[in-house]
């Protein structure tokens, strides 16, 4: 696959798979998915059966209308299913694919990678997303195993094995309350390990208490007892972080190192699809299927109230095109407060992820994004550079010309 940022938006149905549910060999303190196992207290083994795997693959392929189909394997920790499981998946993809081009992306924490896994990924053209939050002292702040032991060196061993076997991979980094203070150390680390494709996600979670034992809350839940999780990134610092990394990237890395958020911002600047749901006008394009066939509206909305149904009783098309799911997607724009709809940067952020929209505006309207302050700071900072790159693209010139332009104008 030549492009590591494959956008699902052109496809009629896109559903991520959770072959082991929330089961993981790590216990990262900020993980939003680890507690989802509590939604299924009656089930001992949260493992997707091969029968369900076949049902999903057959139905998923039958409902596609495009010649290219993307499968995304997500966790929990995906490599806790054996290679034989994924070999079976490839066999089923070939059986039901009817000649389509099928791509596979898999997300992993990297600690279980070995030569066998890397050979398998290389031979079958998997794109691997590996979770790593920066250099050792930053990464190990939150990414530890169930015994509290650090994971950095195991992840780095996995990355070295992927390089050895020529596996295409990108880095998935979480920006939290700790590493947000070290933007340049964070960015330089990825350059030092020669990782050219980087996705970073700000962590924003709120903690409450629910009868099923879960702590994380959906944005609709408003209660005096709900508090921001201590690892949540500060909104203003998030903006400072983005500006600092952007300025460093602008010096010599445009066109060589690809940072998804910067690419998506530029796409919105020129009126194209951003390639990520958070910055798109609507969402609801990307559902998720749990180990038992339950389908939810989104990976970040795996709450009982956002369950669409189960593949054993409803088709994927019925669930993903249900009025409920269509409303979920349309509400991303429709429920924005007036402050957002009148904002100069609405086109760039589109309110960002609905899960982060739990604040009220100065006028008391609900639905303001917690990260608004940071994103505004970032968009204002990058506006002249985005304007220039937009002009270059429209003139069919490389946007990397912005580096020389910035130097000449001493920006």
Over which residues does each language-model region extend?
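Disulfide-bonded cysteines in secreted/extracellular proteins and peptides
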Residues: 24, 28-31, 277, 283, ...
């Amino acid at each position: 696959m030549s492009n590591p940022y494959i956008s699902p938006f052109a496809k009629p149905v896109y559903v991520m798979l959770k072959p082991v549910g929330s089961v993981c060999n790590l216990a990262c303190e900020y993980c939003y998915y680890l507690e989802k196992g509590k939604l299924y207290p009656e089930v001992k083994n949260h493992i997707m059966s091969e029968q369900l795997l076949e049902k999903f693959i057959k139905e998923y392929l039958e409902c596609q209308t495009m010649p290219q189909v993307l499968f995304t394997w997500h966790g929990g920790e995906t490599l806790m299913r054996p290679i034989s499981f994924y070999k079976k998946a490839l066999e089923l993809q070939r059986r039901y694919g009817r000649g389509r081009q099928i791509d596979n992306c898999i997300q992993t924490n990297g600690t279980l990678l070995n030569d066998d896994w890397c050979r398998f990924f290389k031979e079958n053209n998997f794109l691997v997303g590996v979770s790593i939050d920066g250099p050792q002292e930053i990464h190990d702040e939150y990414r530890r195993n169930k015994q509290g032991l650090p994971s950095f060196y195991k992840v780095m061993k996995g990355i070295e094995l992927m390089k050895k076997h020529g596996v295409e991979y990108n880095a998935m980094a979480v920006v939290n309350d700790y590493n947000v203070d070290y933007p340049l150390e964070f960015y330089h680390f990825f350059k030092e390990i020669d990782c050219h494709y980087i996705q970073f996600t700000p962590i924003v979670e709120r903690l409450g208490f629910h009868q099923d034992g879960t702590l994380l809350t959906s944005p609709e839940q408003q209660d005096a007892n709900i508090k921001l999780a201590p690892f949540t990134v500060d909104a203003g610092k998030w903006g400072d972080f983005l500006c600092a990394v952007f300025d460093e990237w602008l010096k010599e890395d445009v066109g060589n190192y690809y940072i998804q958020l910067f690419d998506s911002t530029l796409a919105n600047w020129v009126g194209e699809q951003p390639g990520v749901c958070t910055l798109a006008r609507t969402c609801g394009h990307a559902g998720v299927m749990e180990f038992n066939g339950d389908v939810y509206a989104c990976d970040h909305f795996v709450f009982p109230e956002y369950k669409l149904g189960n593949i054993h009783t409803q088709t994927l098309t019925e669930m993903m095109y249900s009025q409920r799911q269509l409303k979920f997607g349309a509400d991303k724009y429709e429920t924005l407060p007036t402050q957002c709809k009148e904002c100069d940067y609405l086109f760039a952020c589109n309110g960002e992820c609905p899960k982060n929209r739990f604040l009220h505006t100065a006028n008391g309207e609900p639905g303001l994004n917690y990260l608004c302050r940071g994103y505004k700071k970032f968009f204002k900072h990058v506006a002249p550079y985005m304007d220039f790159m937009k002009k270059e693209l429209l003139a069919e010139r490389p946007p990397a010309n912005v580096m020389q332009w910035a130097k000449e104008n001493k920006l």
